[in-house]
């Protein structure tokens, strides 16, 4: 565990790490920017319960009053949920200023990986990672999540990159930076709301024990960076490929027309897709997060068995 002077590790999380028990990190941007209140709080608490039910300790991560928090109370989750998009969406570039100002921040995949690593958690469950945005060849809009995956040794369990992105370029970027992309029970990259994307992952892996063994080998080899596990949304909650792609294309067109860019892009696109699908995309989003939390907890437990 990193004895960072700005880090507060919840007692339950600290005890689990010290005892070599499984811990699963969770981000907080999904609470503040990913869903409306009260669904955001209900979802966050349910995700924590799923992790407990599968033998691990949840560590929801955020920045509160300038403190890096690894493990939140239910009251702190409620606070973030109610504050919603008034909370700064905090990536790596924001950390120092937020800490110095004693401000609040909701952690992205990037900052969740950083703080999880400081706190001693090796596995992190999220919905989908950021990536290379459509049109990035001219805008250079590439999520910091990809750089963090290349440099921080944390396993990230997700449902693929968010399908609002350019998935092909995202995979190319990860390959360039040496980040292994594994498919859980699939050789095809899942595309967040749907199980298929038309792109292949590097390797198919079929059990949590296999995932844990691969990550343990990565750590033992001293390889820099993390590992991306892509876990397809359960069939019964997957959206129709054509319906979601139409909604995404329309949302991207509206974002371009309104000049939306930078950190505002993803929340805008997710909200617009939700509106265009009559709320179906939010339901799918919630279910895929539950599914990823389950797999992350099972994998974290297997990782602990390996010592």
Where are the regions that the model predicts?
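Solvent-exposed alpha-helices and their adjacent loops that cap or buttress functional pockets
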Residues: 15-18, 23-24, 53, 115-118, ...
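Active-site glycine-rich loop that binds ribose-phosphate moieties when present
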Residues: 106-109, 137-150, 154-175, 209-213
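A C-terminal functional module that forms or caps the active site or interfaces directly
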Residues: 223-291
